[in-house]
A protein has these predicted regions:
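Active-site core segments that coordinate phosphate-bearing ligands/cofactors
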Residues: 2-45, 50, 55-66, 70-71, ...
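A structural motif corresponding to the C-terminal end of an alpha-helix
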Residues: 71-78
Length: 343
């Protein structure tokens, strides 16, 4: 789904047979979700929250972009029809089970944490991570961040603004290899909780997403090197995630009516030292979600709109900010490093 336009252009340039089949109207070009939904129900369609990531969708018109289709040489006839997030695809594999919702995982994660509440904001930390903000019923563009359809049905459409982080848990898999740490010995949250560092680590192995958008480069070590204490490097790696969250939140400030009082965090990477660091860095309390998989819960909420969840039980631990001059100096050091090495 991600950046499908350039992928389409590359494939038809490299494969003349594929190009001819597309030209003859024999094939649809679309994301995996569209392939699966058609395979299971026989209904062709790509829903809007995923279509947004193709570089072929015009978020203002709610349709495929004529400019982008022309740019990448994509014929509208080879694209599946656009459908809302909540849509009657039919029954799956001749069963009595209907397919009624197809949605992007980060959209579902925010719905799982905050429903469709306007102005809601949440974080999700898995292999990668993201900060998601419900911008309401008007598409909103923020420099450095991604704007998408958040939710849609036949009557209404909501939009979200999101900052993605390429490496969260995958960062620690990378450091296992770089530092020669066995996977079962990493325990990054334990290592980070007992260690402090003045160093800065910029993870370049998988590139940087929001708000810098840089392709892969060599990791940057500042006041660190691979001969440093490995726990210190792990701590600096964890802090890089927090710094990116802070940078994304600063990008969001102009479109938020007020500073959030609580930032909820879900996903397997939502561990105590990271959440405390984010709270200290941003000055916003961070709540650890009681439910590990908020993505699946988001789907449940869409399918059961009358279900009333108990918001008082949505977090089991709140990390309150502990302001300090040291954290301010560390943030400035990060920003200076990004200015020097990235921008």
């Amino acid at each position: 789904a991600h950046f499908g336009g350039p992928k389409f252009l590359h494939m038809i340039r490299e494969n003349p047979q594929l190009k001819n089949r597309v030209k003859n109207g024999e094939l649809y070009f679309g994301p995996l979700s569209a392939f699966l939904s058609q395979a299971m129900t026989g209904t062709a369609g790509v829903e809007e929250s995923i279509a947004c990531r193709s570089l072929l969708y015009d978020i203002h018109r709610g349709d495929w972009s004529d400019f982008a289709l022309n740019l990448f040489g994509v014929s509208p006839q080879c694209l599946p029809p656009l459908v809302p997030v909540k849509y009657d695809f039919g029954y799956m594999l001749d069963s009595k089970i209907p397919l009624a919702v197809v949605i992007g995982d980060q959209q579902a994660a925010l719905i799982g944490q905050a429903g469709l509440k306007l102005g809601s904001i949440a974080t999700n930390f898995g292999t990668s991570g993201s900060v998601q903000f419900n911008a309401g019923q008007n598409p909103t563009i923020v420099n450095g961040l991604i704007s998408s359809v958040f939710y849609s049905d036949e009557n209404i459409k909501y939009f979200m603004v999101e900052g993605t982080i390429n490496a969260c848990n995958s960062l620690f898999y990378h450091l296992e290899e770089e530092l020669g740490i066995a996977h079962d010995k990493m325990e990054w949250d334990y290592r980070a909780s007992k260690t402090e560092t003045d160093g800065i680590f910029i993870p370049g192995f998988n590139g940087l997403a929001a708000p810098y958008w840089r392709p892969g480069f060599n990791d940057v070590y500042i006041d660190l090197d691979k001969r440093s204490d490995e726990d210190e490097i792990v701590r600096a790696g964890m802090e890089s995630i927090g710094f990116l969250v802070s940078d994304i939140l600063e990008c969001l400030e102009p479109i938020m009516s007020s500073k959030p009082s609580l930032l909820t965090a879900a996903g397997g990477g939502s561990r105590s030292p990271l959440l405390q660091f984010i709270a200290d860095l941003t000055g916003i309390s961070v709540g650890h979600s009681t439910m590990k998989d908020r993505t699946a819960y988001g789907i449940f909420r869409l399918l059961n709109p009358t279900y009333q969840s108990d918001s008082s039980k949505s977090v089991d631990q709140i990390f309150s900010p502990i302001p300090s001059q040291k954290i301010n100096e560390k943030k400035l050091k990060w920003l200076n490093a990004m200015e020097k090495f990235i921008k």
